[in-house]
Amino acid sequence: MEVKEEKLMEEKQRLPEKTIPVFTVLKNGAILKNIFVVNSRDFSSPERNGSTVSDDDGEVEEILVVGRHPDCDILLTHPSISRFHLEIRSISSRQKLFVTDLSSVHGTWVRDLRIEPHGCVEVEEGDTIRIGGSTRIYRLHWIPLSRAYDLDNPFVSPLDASTVLEQEEENRMLEAENLEVAQHQSLENTTSGDEGVLHLDVTSEGTGSSVPSEDEDTYVTTREMSMPVASPSVLTLVRDSVETQKLQFNEDLQTSPKWDLDVIESVAEKLSGSFVRSTQQSGGDVEGLGCSELFDAAEADECDVRGDGGLHLNVISEKMESSVPNMIEAENLEVAQHQSLANTALGDDEDLHLDVTSEGTGSSVPSEDEDTYITTMEISVPLASPNVLTLARDSIKTQKLQSTQDFQTPTMWDLDVVEAAAEKPSSSCVLGKKLSGGYVEELGCFELFVAAEADKCDVRGDGSLHLNEISERMESSMSNKEDDPFLAAKETSSLPLSTDFINPETLWLVEDVQASPEFCTSSVKANAENPSSGCSPSTEQIDGCFETSGCSAFDLAAEVESLSLHQEVSEETEFVTKEVMGVSSEPLGKADIRSHEENGESEDSRQVIEVSAEPVAKADIQSHEENGETEGSRQVIEVSPKSFSEAEPTIEILTGEAQGIIGSEFPSELAVETESENLLHQKSIGETKNEIRSHEDYGETEDYGETECSWPDIAVSPSSVSPPEPTLEILTDEARGLLGSEFLSEVTVETEIENLLHQKSNVETKADILIHEDYGETEVSRQIITVSPNSFSKAEPTLETEDSRQQARGLVGSDSEFQSEVAMKTECENLLNQKRNGETKVSSRQASPVSDCLSTPKDRLSSINTDDIQSLCSSSQPPSESEVNPATDQDQESGIISETEKPKTELLIGSGRSEKYYSLSEIEGEENTDIGRLSRCPIPSALAAKTSEDTKLIEELSSSDSGSQENQTPETHAVRDDVLCDMDSSSTCNIWSRRGKAASVLKIRTNKSQGKQKQTGRQPKDKLHRKQALSDKSISLTIHHGAEILEPEIFTPDKENLTPSSHMLKRLQDIGDVKDSKSSLKLSGKSCSSLVHSSIAVLASEAFTEPEIFTPDKENLTPSSHMLKRLREFGDIKDTKGSSSKATRKPFFDIRMEENVMVEQEPEDLHSLGSKSKLKHEPLAPKKKAERAPFQPLLEKSSFQSQSYTEASSTASARNNISRGIRSSSNLSDAKSKMKWTIVLDTSSLLDKESRKPLQLLQGLKGTHLVVPRTVLRELNEVKRSRSFLFRRRTEIASSALDWIEECKVNSKWWIQVQSPTEETKAIAPTPPVTPQSNGSSAFPFSLHWNNYAPEIDSPTSEDQVLECALLYRNRNRDEKLVLLSNDVTLKIKAMAEGVICETPHEFYESLVNPFSERFMWTESTARGRTWSHLDNDVLRERYNDRACRRKSTYNRGESGAAAKGLKLILLHNSHYGHTH
């Protein structure tokens, strides 16, 4: 090697060697490869070019293109690199290299500076280049040409080599540090970072023992220790506070698979505080570990380490030397009692993990928990938020855990956990010790769990404290000063709760696995109490004995197997009694939460129990109230979405438990089952059944008899039932608690229904009416009853009897005091928040006091339908204008009845359900979406009776209209509208008054009339025309004295969010203007009749309200703008033509309607004719054009109704007008119909693979229709059957084309059509001349001429047959565009001669999707997401219009482009053929 190098040096000295540029590719500091920029001549003969540099090519400039395109010189495949990204120009003789960015999208960086598009930058040696979004770095070097061919010694630049060496040195240093850490077991830097996770990983290793770790993040091997170290910013161990921490391991391999761990930890004391240690010796000594400022959790962030965010103390026991004599070596013989002490630290996610692992010679304990490390036992205790549970420097005392395990029995072990409480200098905390053979009774903490602002822990499904204890022995070199009986006898003093320190109270961590080998916690008890009351710890033994030592708060023993219950305490500073339910992490089948209220009183206590856990099959929450009174308690039980498994979409209706509370005397059956079915169908998958059974010890609900109304709002939180988080807010428990705890009338339980109902957007809840009559008093609990449309049986409508209605009216009329309170207490916002999907919410708050109707046990609620609610709501309405002005109202009623001469006509307005279920209350609920507003004022029963009579009159008005639908007369509509206006005037306190609109705008419509509006559909438009004309001509008959001239208002029934069409409103206003400009009314002879007068009078009464649109019952029904254009154009055309005798004919009205009403202008008839001819033509549209599906009526009855109108109006003049309307509509819709394309295929377009891609993109596109001629199928079949080896590829393409046609026939049958044999036409040869020799000498040439061309005529080519097919379909469908797709130039020329558009499939597809093309099919569409709207139009035009030209200029090279000029002209002309510019 040295000889070669010397020779190379000599050659360099003699002659200058040619250098070439090389790019070294670096990624993450590692060299990936080198890119040598070598000329082709240099590559062919490196020796010659390497030895000498010729003068002629000294200034040769090499140009390289870099990009993603295959034609680039340097091909890079990163997706952020443009196809032609940058250009590199190099002059090797001068060692100059320049880079030019070719307007790349993501740019090019040289020396970390982005260069401008088309900007040229010189790159020097050592500079770096970054291309696009790629992380690779290209560093430029100049090397000798011969160096590039030295494959044995790859080129590495010194700069890159130093970088690689530095990286390797860093790796070696890190490995050395890790090895040192593993050898010395340095725990001084054990910190707990922002995630609040402290890992003390000490692996217990013995002969042949291996701990299988189930955690992903820890790597526990035989001689290696993995120590995750968090950020020390928050959780730091002060240097002065930690002197030494030593672990001493003593293992006895001779006895059994048991081991002892002695951990001796010495603790330093801070100047400001003293550390007190309490020890407990029960066969073993455990010393506490005290550290100052161990966890300052106030600043700690949420932890997401290891997926469960807990505080992990994984103590991996190692043999370590100890500076302290091992005092408990003799006690190693007692292998049944191993005690572990770990830092009881509080993480931010409220989890503490003490992992207990037992191992010995060949013993391995499998983990029961899928998340924990190797846990044989897991204790889960709910913790609170770190901002409350913070340990101050001086408030931290010793916390000791003493764990005793006995592995002699396989399924049983005992845990002794003793934790010494933290004390402030001014207070002390008792640690009750009870040493009974290794049993620990209690762990004293005062206010340990305060869940103020407790964050939800998305860790393992529950936010609880996990104590995964690794049983170890820990000792301290300090003396056992605290092993004093005085400490156990200390009294607990109640301290004010602060966010700076924790006052430990009693916490029971009791484990008993004798009954179950699944290591589930039997019970966890946490008692907390108000600061004002002292709490002495109560003890609980593992044997199951409960000893109560006088705790005045609730003692809640929670036995949970799969629910994690953590507390949520509101941010108020009130200290309320909380009952914390402990959990076990094992997801078992059923959870029983029993709440025992034992002796004691709790004043104004509030119990908040939130269930948030892993998949739960069934939760039985049983509430027992035992001797004692709870005054003013509020109970909200919330079930979090995580507590539901996504397997059973079931929701238990809360009324069932209410039935259990009230007893068999009050069966609540008002559509409870049907409503539960509806809810079950509406629920998304992911909610489990919650059965809540309430058991009351006394069997009855006793009320004190006051007439105060408590209002337990029973509702379901709605966002909780949304599909992503199926949550059910179980609020009936509060009703249960209220009814069962003897203070129903005392407490007004406002269970924050606003907070819950603002979430409820699209779920309806069902609550029953809870009415108790105890001691003769009526206790009324207010509720919201949601009546779903599906809850009513359409087949068997239950009609409420008149007697029950009178009873209801009498009850409400008599109890005016209660009624006023009910009316004033009504909250309409609840219904407004709940009403999102258009279900009718019936105000049962007025119906709830119907105690007389509710007294029967069997038919209490099943017989109550909305008629009762109607009567109640009617009685609670404010005084209408008829009450204020009775004389006028009576005149109105008598006038209406006498003029119309049909008092039995029913008011037919509604949503199509059974009309017997409809009442005034429900109608107002539909119209106003604000039920309670109408019932704010108490009304005497007399007005209720009168309103019921009015309602009865309205109900009786439907007898004639319920029959044939086409026998409608204008008087019927007039009566309906007049009664509607009467109702409008009576509803003053409605939703419109809140919005600043006059109350008379609102139309109250009952069932049949609304259905009729949906039936006739279009008839109200003509009525509005006549009304507008009458109002403009000032035909005023004083019916509404108090009516005002209102601004145009739109009536949108039954849908709160329905936005009316502004186009239709403009059209109606334009019609009114047109009518103003016309001549005066022409009255016919029959117009003087009383019928016409009455109809004019009633129409004039509504004429003061300007045009309104009635859109029937569908919130997504959008009026057709195309129809409106046709209507406007009809008006313009007929206005210019003037009056016509034919204009008085009305094809869509019955003959009798013409006889009754003849008061119209000629333009009115023309306008109505326009609207009706359109509707007459509309049912025929689906038969002819499939694209008109959006214009079809969306209601079920409308097709039948339009057919009935078609039959009823089948007169000659109607047919003439309709035919003219169809012709004019076809002319008007020409702009729309030109967007329909009939596509005829050629064989060449299917055999070309590139041409078939656009066809596949066109598949199923509305507005296009594909026709496949039969000759194309024949040709494809012939190609497929050809077995030629040379054309095997063509055979495969033909086979795939036939498969695609078959797939289209199956999947998109409406889109593709194969030409039928009857449609296929054959070319017929012309008849030859009779006498070929008749022309004398010219006969022979003629004969030869004929014979030469006769064979071609007899057998036409496939192109001719395809063209004939195209001409056939063009003549058949004149209103559609036809295009012939072919790549054959001959066929294109023939098609051009016939005037048929012929293009390639690619050109046709691009013309459809080009937004600047005349053929663009989505001109009226709305852009969604990122579309072309964010680019400049010029850029788009350049992109779309110049695409073909750029492609041709790119691929045509020189001579070939010149040779095809003529063909280009033909193709260019053809591509724009038929386009109208």
From Swiss-Prot:
State what protein this is by name: FHA domain-containing protein PS1
The source's superkingdom equals Eukaryota
Q: Where is this region: Disordered?
A: 188-218, 588-644, 789-818, 832-911, 942-979, 1004-1030, 1159-1225
Q: What happens when the gene is disrupted?
A: Diploid pollen grains (dyads of spores instead of tetrads) due to defective meiosis II. Abnormal spindle orientation at meiosis II.
Per the entry, what this protein does is: Required for normal spindle orientation at male meiosis II and normal formation of tetrad of microspores. Not involved in female meiosis.
Which biological processes are named by the entry's GO terms?
meiotic cell cycle; pollen development
Composition bias type Low complexity, residue spans: 870-883, 1213-1225
Fetch the InterPro entries from UniProt. FHA_dom, PIN-like_dom_sf, PIN_dom, SMAD_FHA_dom_sf
In what ranges is there compositional bias, type Basic and acidic residues?
589-607
UniProt keyword list = Meiosis
- Lineage, uppermost ranks: Eukaryota, Viridiplantae, Streptophyta, Embryophyta, Tracheophyta
